[in-house]
């Protein structure tokens, strides 16, 4: 989950060139439906790609098929597609916050919104989480929608925390929205349910928890080396430092590491367990393998 710079591609100029270039496979269809495509591009720009305000599936099947072809095999006017694919967002997935991006995908799914198949502002670097949300981009009311990495400035704020409950040796992991005045909790929760929970985030955090259980410093890297017994104040300081480091490393507070650490910071039970674990291992009263 990360705010990205909006691509500077002049999509409307490219559309006009495609309309007049007889060497382009889609030219006859774009020429026939140019006014529709032009209006749809303007609609997207005026509404920041909001799925509640952008109406899809109004172009012909023939044009849709040609646009899909161009997306898979871009010609010279569409080189920006290859550039977006190659540059990506190498430090974090803009949709879910994982430390990976493997592809370029559509914010508004091409199955339901074919008008924007090659539209640069609808093409976002992503990991496999975007395909796992399938065609779900909005819910039952206009507060329920997936965040748009190009347009949702709230992504620069901390929006999501992990939560840990039950037996802290192997806790139940979930996600909670962090309220702020810029976006409804319902929007954050929809993104959590539609994107985060369908990703591998919970499995990743479960694995990280077990690594932390064996050696807390492996995950909370700001804990000093050596046989130092920590106070709760020490631990809280190290957690905040680590959270800040991960925010800076990934250039967003909504990466998986920061969500994980934020969940510990916000849980008295998790912090006490971690403090007891760290000090017990340091003093030899707890085996890292127990």
Protein language model features and the residues they cover:
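Short, intrinsically disordered, charge-biased short linear motifs at domain edges
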Residues: 77-84, 111-116
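Generic hydrophobic, helix-prone segments enriched in Leu/Val/Ile
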Residues: 22, 28-41, 71, 160, ...
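C-terminal, charged low-complexity interaction regions
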Residues: 2-18, 191-290
């Amino acid at each position: 989950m990360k705010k990205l710079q909006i691509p500077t591609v002049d999509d409307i100029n490219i559309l006009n060139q495609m309309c007049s270039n007889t060497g382009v496979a889609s030219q006859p269809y774009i020429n026939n439906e140019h006014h529709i495509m032009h209006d749809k591009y303007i609609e997207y720009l005026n509404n920041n790609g909001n799925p509640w305000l952008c109406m899809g599936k109004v172009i012909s099947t023939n044009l849709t098929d040609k646009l899909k072809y161009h997306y898979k095999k871009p010609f010279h006017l569409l080189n920006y597609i290859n550039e977006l694919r190659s540059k990506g967002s190498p430090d974090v997935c803009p949709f879910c916050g994982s430390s990976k991006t493997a592809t370029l995908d559509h914010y508004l799914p091409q199955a339901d919104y074919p008008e924007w198949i090659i539209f640069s502002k609808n093409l976002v670097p992503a990991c496999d989480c975007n395909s796992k949300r399938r065609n779900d981009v909005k819910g039952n009311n206009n507060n329920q929608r997936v965040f748009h990495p190009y347009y949702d400035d709230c992504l620069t704020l901390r929006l999501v925390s992990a939560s840990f409950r039950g037996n802290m040796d192997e806790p139940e992991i979930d996600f909670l929205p962090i309220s702020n005045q810029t976006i409804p909790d319902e929007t954050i929760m929809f993104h959590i349910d539609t994107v985060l929970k369908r990703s591998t985030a919970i499995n990743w955090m479960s694995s990280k928890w077990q690594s932390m259980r064996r050696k807390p410093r492996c995950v909370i890297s700001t804990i000093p080396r050596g046989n130092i017994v920590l106070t709760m104040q020490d631990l809280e300081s190290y957690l905040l430092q680590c959270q800040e480091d991960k925010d800076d490393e990934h250039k967003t507070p909504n990466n998986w590491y920061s969500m994980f650490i934020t969940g510990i910071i916000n849980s008295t039970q998790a912090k006490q367990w971690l403090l007891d674990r760290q000090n017990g291992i340091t003093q030899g009263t707890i085996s890292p393998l127990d």
